[in-house]
UniProtKB/Swiss-Prot annotation:
The gene is murB. This is UDP-N-acetylenolpyruvoylglucosamine reductase. Belongs to the MurB family. The lineage of its organism: Bacteria, Bacillati, Bacillota, Bacilli, Lactobacillales. It comes from the Bacteria. Keywords: Cell cycle, Cell division, Cell shape, Cell wall biogenesis/degradation, Cytoplasm, FAD, Flavoprotein, NADP, Oxidoreductase, Peptidoglycan synthesis. Its cofactor is FAD. It is found in: Cytoplasm. Pfam families: FAD_binding_4, MurB_C. InterPro entries: FAD-bd_PCMH (IPR016166), FAD-bd_PCMH-like_sf (IPR036318), FAD-bd_PCMH_sub1 (IPR016167), FAD-bd_PCMH_sub2 (IPR016169), MurB (IPR003170), MurB_C (IPR011601), MurB_C_sf (IPR036635), Oxid_FAD_bind_N (IPR006094). Its EC number is 1.3.1.98.
Amino acid sequence: MIEELAGIDIRINEPLKKYTYTKVGGPADYLVFPRNRLELTRVVKYANNHSIPWIVLGNASNLIVRDGGIRGFVIMFNKLNTVTVDGYTIEAEAGANLIETTKVAKFHSLTGFEFACGIPGSVGGAIFMNAGAYGGEIANIFLSAKVLTPEGDIKTMTAREMAFGYRHSAIQKSGDIVISAKFALKPGDFEQISQEMNRLNYLRQLKQPLEYPSCGSVFKRPEGHFAGQLIMEAKLKGYRIGGVEVSEKHAGFMINVDHGTAKDYEHLIAHVIETVEHNSGIRLEREVRIIGEQESLNQKEKS
């Protein structure tokens, strides 16, 4: 198989915890780093022709990969990271770092992207989740995207076709994968943009446990409430299972403090959901995605 995909960076049985923000995750059968669209389509069409499962991880930020890892091809877009500016429009490849993309907007005195200046992850992942913070979200500036269909074809999707909602986009169900996207910004003042980004980054550092590995915001915001507040009222701040605990700094975050596992994360999430519902009557809904397989007995014996 590797011979047919010669020239493409493919790593066999690669531990995914080396690449995830949570620092958990078992091995990928084949971890693939395409350098361009041609390599990407080669991999996807090969996988489809040979009935090999494939998945795109983006930058693996708002995500938990189970300890058993992922079968088939796991495609990471780190090398698809070009960002260009044309007038008031920014075009970014899906693997571009979201924070770095907001810095490009600032450099060109373009406003509208400030809300995302501290959101970790990739541009593609941000579109997938309609990422947002501090009153802004991707849907507000999204123009269009080139996407790869599950069949391996490339098409363009408009903002209307994306059907954005709160932490939702149409591609969560369709299986289409963002390759690149265009964002419509407005001319602004460099100093004002810089000041706003500095303010938002200060708030993030003040309120969020950025010094620890985490999957970001674990739960969606319940209507009329804040997940972190509900978790705090349930007296779960600092609650720990294995190496993962509810952050003392922000109860909406779960941090990997001591060689935690995906199993620790899953058990802690389930405990928080159950306890908060018992305490408040409100059932929290996960924002973080959980993918992959549970660790098998053979894998445990080898580890």
